[in-house]
């Protein structure tokens, strides 16, 4: 690297000293004066998604956007991130603009509802003011806004049905993100904005889908996750979950456009054991021979559901497999978890009764 001459260095030092006097210590600095460490992240609770994000989860101090069609799992992902943060002693704020949070479902996903800070604002302005106050406190580790589409401007609420309010919500979001972005970074908070899809009228080529709230969130978000339900998971005639795919559409902290696939089981959330089996097979840590799954000398079971059930009943084996996968991708090791087997689960599910993924549209 070239060396800056003495006169330039003196001028820079003088300018920096003047800036610090005017704006305070820390307002300007040399990047090399501070330890550059790997970016801190909060796990998503899904091994495959942590790998796809490149840093082991969602980055701290950044804005995250999760969007997709209805009932695709957007809130489930946000609640899993909240639960993972709480496990590490983090505080979570939840702006429930849709007024639709189910506390019992959140509890099943591992969220400590007693310590969850929740607000159900009357207007979009109120919701974003509360969000800013929580972030500015410096005590919130994860803030979830559910959803951007439900942040209705005050003028629209007080107006008549049928009144035109073009661009009001976009202006509201643009102003809010300008104010929030710097504070979120300084307080090392993860701000998750859940968003809905709309369709643009008259689009002939390309996707007509767009997200609500204008373009500001697309620019300010460091990570954008497109979540889709791709299949139904059946046991007999009953649908017991969804097969879900997430595509990382934007990523400022790692290479984008990676994908993750996993099961979201009803009343359970993301199937951690199912994810370990899938990624383990892909990475050849778990061996699959016909319908049988094995890990070294340990036979996990015949059929994917038996393998999942074995890992639920033997969390030490699941942890060992997961940490081998994490080591391969330079991710921090996982801690021991205990997941009880589902109520009424048979000790050995035959391969014939294995849960099937319905590929019909």
Swiss-Prot record:
GO terms for cellular component: cytosol. Residues 344-361 have a biased composition (Basic and acidic residues). It comes from the Bacteria. ATP binds at residues 68-75. GO terms for biological process: DNA recombination; DNA repair; SOS response. Keywords: ATP-binding, Cytoplasm, DNA damage, DNA recombination, DNA repair, DNA-binding, Nucleotide-binding, SOS response. InterPro entries: AAA+_ATPase, DNA_recomb/repair_RecA, DNA_recomb/repair_RecA_CS, P-loop_NTPase, RecA-like_C, RecA-like_N, RecA_ATP-bd, RecA_C_sf. GO terms for molecular function: ATP binding; ATP hydrolysis activity; ATP-dependent DNA damage sensor activity; damaged DNA binding; single-stranded DNA binding. Residues 342-361 are annotated as: Disordered. Gene3D superfamilies: P-loop containing nucleotide triphosphate hydrolases. It is found in: Cytoplasm. Can catalyze the hydrolysis of ATP in the presence of single-stranded DNA, the ATP-dependent uptake of single-stranded DNA by duplex DNA, and the ATP-dependent hybridization of homologous single-stranded DNAs. It interacts with LexA causing its activation and leading to its autocatalytic cleavage. HAMAP family: RecA (MF_00268). Belongs to the RecA family. This is Protein RecA. It comes from Clostridium beijerinckii (strain ATCC 51743 / NCIMB 8052) (Clostridium acetobutylicum). The gene is recA.
């Amino acid at each position: 690297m070239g060396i800056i001459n003495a006169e330039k260095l003196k001028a820079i030092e003088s300018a920096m000293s003047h800036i610090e006097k005017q704006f305070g210590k820390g307002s300007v600095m040399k990047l090399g004066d501070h330890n550059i460490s790997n970016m801190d992240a909060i796990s998503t609770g899904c091994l495959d998604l942590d790998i796809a994000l490149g840093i082991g989860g969602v980055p701290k101090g950044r804005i995250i956007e999760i969007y997709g069609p209805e009932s695709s799992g957007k809130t489930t992902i946000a609640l899993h991130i909240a639960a993972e943060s709480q496990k590490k002693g983090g505080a979570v704020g939840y702006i429930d603009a849709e007024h639709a949070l189910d506390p019992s479902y959140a509890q099943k996903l591992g969220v400590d509802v007693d310590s969850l800070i929740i607000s159900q604002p009357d207007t979009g302005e109120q919701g974003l003011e509360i969000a800013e106050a929580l972030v500015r406190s410096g005590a919130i580790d994860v803030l979830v806004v559910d959803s951007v589409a439900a942040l209705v401007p005050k003028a629209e609420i007080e107006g008549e049905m049928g009144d035109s309010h073009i661009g009001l919500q976009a202006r509201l979001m643009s102003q809010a993100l300008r104010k929030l972005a710097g504070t979120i970074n300084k307080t090392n908070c993860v701000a998750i904005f859940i968003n809905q899809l709309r369709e643009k009228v008259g689009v002939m080529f390309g996707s007509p889908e767009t997200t609500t709230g204008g373009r500001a969130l697309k620019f300010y978000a460091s990570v954008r996750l497109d979540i889709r339900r791709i299949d139904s998971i059946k046991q007999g005639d009953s649908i017991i979950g969804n097969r879900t795919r997430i595509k990382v559409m934007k990523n400022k902290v790692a290479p984008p456009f990676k994908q993750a696939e996993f099961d979201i089981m009803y009343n359970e959330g993301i199937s951690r054991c199912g994810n370990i089996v899938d990624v383990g097979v892909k990475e050849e840590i778990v061996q699959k021979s016909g319908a049988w799954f094995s890990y070294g000398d340990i036979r996990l079971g015949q059929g994917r559901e038996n393998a999942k059930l074995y890992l639920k009943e033997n969390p030490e084996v699941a942890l060992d497999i997961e940490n081998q996968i994490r080591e391969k991708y330079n991710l921090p090791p996982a801690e021991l978890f205990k997941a009880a087997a589902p109520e009424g689960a048979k000790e050995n599910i035959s391969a014939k009764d294995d849960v099937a993924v319905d590929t019909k549209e």
